[in-house]
């Protein structure tokens, strides 16, 4: 080759390589491919923040084998490898469930929600990662666990795109088995239960093994969740099975001590009901489990409809003892935590879900004593405690509307606030705890007829401000003040994922729950509060238990006679 032509040849090759690189980069930017331990997966590019910021979404990645056939009522197993490139551009099927939630949300928001298929084959996760992220980026990772009373919900309920793009973090949203498929227990080796919790552990193992390929740092993982998702996060904090799988925890309107989501016994309280509803004439637990494994998805759904909640159990493995015992004995992972509640946890949605909304509306001074007595029994309290509850929450009030409001306050404290405070006080001596009460009344609740005007922050209302979008990623119309609240909450949550501390320059200061029991009132103008519900905490943790012991002592003496 003549020497005078060599530079042209080299120039042509360089141009060709440049064009090839541009072409490959262009392909990657629209249709990214990432490696996992079990195969390659193709995602998609989505734009957020007025279409100027790109996020890669990888949807429906399997983190376990389909829990079907012999794997029904069994611990999850690692996923099978696949050849070729798996499509990760469409939402995964949600786990089998009775869909209580969607009609309620549609009515309240005045929106039409997308249809998502349902299957027992549902152990998948979604990943949202900034488009610039690559292996070695070492971005903080936040793993979202959806709520839904352990009977409903899905990974796709909350879209992590905007949070990932705004705060330059990796968001993972996981699914887990629900209802009886997720939590049925016979109390012995044939079906120990907590299958849904074991799914969550499996998902966290998958994150440790694979998230680096998506730009995440496996050594900087924060788990967060709402309602039953918060209960799940809190349960993972006390479970020996999750050691080393995460480094921070955020419990939003749910902790491991929520009364309806944990059973005191290894055998679930509803096991006889399952046996009866299933039509399984089984002589023992082994035969019952075998019979239930033979049921179709439709038959399982029919059994599920009986239950509005399915509690976890003390199985000796995921939960060696009751969460309260584990917390009291400091047998938990001492990771930094954010724990919080909404100001009107039982303002509307929870009573509606529990079928109590019409009953509450009919409360008067005359009907209240009998109603409180029946609720005390449901709360696993001696019926005689109803007088004490009446005295503490209602006093001499006669006005029906005030009585109804005070009953909702009682429900809120019993179900959410007191359990959250107890967990926070157990943990704060061993790791930083930041507590909040979300107080803002959202402007985007369209159907004011569906939700009473007196409700400020109902159960789960804060979630839209964490993700910057409504359910299923639907855009929300925020006021200018709400946009600032949204920006601040995203920053608090992301700061915590980065540093184990929500604070940074430019944000209202959020103190630890140490001096003067300080917490943050999350509203348009955040403010520091002190000793949230201190009197009620004393009532539920000191006065009421003492009264119960006195009643038991009196009953014991009576039985001796």
From Swiss-Prot:
It catalyses: a carboxylic ester + H2O = an alcohol + a carboxylate + H(+). Transmembrane segments: none annotated. A motif (Prevents secretion from ER) lies at residues 558-561. Its main location: endoplasmic reticulum. Disulfide bonds join 95-122, 280-291. Belongs to the type-B carboxylesterase/lipase family. This is Liver carboxylesterase. It comes from Mesocricetus auratus (Golden hamster).
């Amino acid at each position: 080759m003549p020497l005078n032509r060599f530079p042209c040849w080299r120039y042509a090759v360089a141009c060709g390589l440049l064009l090839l690189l541009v072409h490959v980069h262009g392909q990657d930017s629209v249709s990214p491919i990432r490696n996992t331990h079990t195969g390659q997966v193709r995602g998609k590019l989505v734009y957020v923040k007025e279409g100027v910021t790109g996020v890669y979404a990888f949807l429906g990645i399997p983190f376990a084998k389909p829990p079907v056939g012999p794997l029904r009522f069994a611990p999850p197993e690692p996923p099978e490898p696949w050849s070729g490139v798996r499509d990760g551009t469409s939402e995964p099927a949600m786990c089998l469930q009775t869909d209580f939630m969607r009609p309620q949300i549609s009515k309240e928001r005045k929106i039409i929600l997308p249809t998502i298929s349902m299957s027992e084959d549902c152990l998948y996760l979604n990943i949202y990662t900034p488009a610039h992220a690559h292996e070695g980026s070492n971005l903080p990772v936040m793993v979202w666990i959806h709520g839904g009373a352990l009977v409903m919900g899905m990974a796709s309920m909350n879209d992590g795109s905007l949070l990932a793009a705004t705060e330059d973090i990796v968001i993972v949203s996981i699914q887990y088995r629900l209802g009886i498929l997720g939590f049925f227990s016979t109390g012995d080796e044939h079906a120990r239960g907590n299958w849904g919790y074991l799914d969550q552990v499996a998902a966290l193992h998958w994150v440790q093994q694979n998230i680096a390929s998506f730009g995440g740092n496996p050594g900087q993982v924060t788990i967060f969740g709402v309602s039953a998702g918060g209960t799940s996060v809190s349960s993972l904090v006390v479970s020996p099975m999750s050691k080393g799988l995460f480094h921070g925890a955020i419990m939003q309107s749910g902790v491991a001590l929520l009364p309806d989501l944990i059973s005191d016994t290894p055998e679930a309280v509803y096991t006889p009901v399952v046996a009866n509803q299933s039509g399984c004439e089984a002589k023992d637990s082994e035969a019952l489990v075998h019979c239930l494994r033979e049921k179709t998805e439709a038959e399982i759904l029919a059994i599920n409809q009986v239950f509005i909640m399915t509690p976890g159990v003390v199985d000796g493995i995921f939960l060696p003892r009751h969460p309260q015992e584990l917390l009291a004995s400091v047998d938990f992972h001492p990771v930094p935590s954010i724990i919080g509640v909404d100001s009107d946890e039982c303002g509307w949605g929870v009573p509606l879900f529990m079928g109590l909304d019409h009953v509450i509306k009919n409360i008067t001074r005359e009907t209240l004593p009998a109603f409180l007595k029946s609720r005390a029994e449901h709360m696993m309290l001696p019926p005689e405690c109803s007088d004490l509850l009446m005295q503490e929450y209602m006093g001499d009030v006669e006005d029906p509307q005030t009585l109804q409001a005070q009953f909702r306050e009682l429900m809120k404290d019993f179900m959410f606030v007191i359990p959250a405070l107890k967990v926070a006080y157990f943990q704060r001596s061993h790791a930083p705890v930041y507590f909040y009460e979300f107080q803002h009344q959202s402007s985007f609740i369209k159907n004011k007829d569906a939700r009473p005007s007196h409700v400020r922050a109902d159960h789960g209302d804060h979630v839209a401000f964490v993700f910057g979008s409504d359910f299923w990623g639907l855009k929300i119309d925020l006021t200018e003040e709400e946009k600032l609240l949204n920006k601040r909450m995203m920053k608090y949550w992301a700061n915590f994922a980065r540093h184990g501390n929500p604070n940074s320059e430019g944000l209202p200061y959020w103190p630890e729950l140490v001096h003067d029991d300080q917490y943050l009132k999350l509203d348009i103008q955040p403010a520091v509060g002190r000793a949230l519900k201190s009197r009620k905490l004393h009532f539920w943790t000191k006065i009421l238990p003492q009264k119960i012991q006195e009643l038991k002592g009196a009953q014991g003496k009576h039985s001796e006679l």
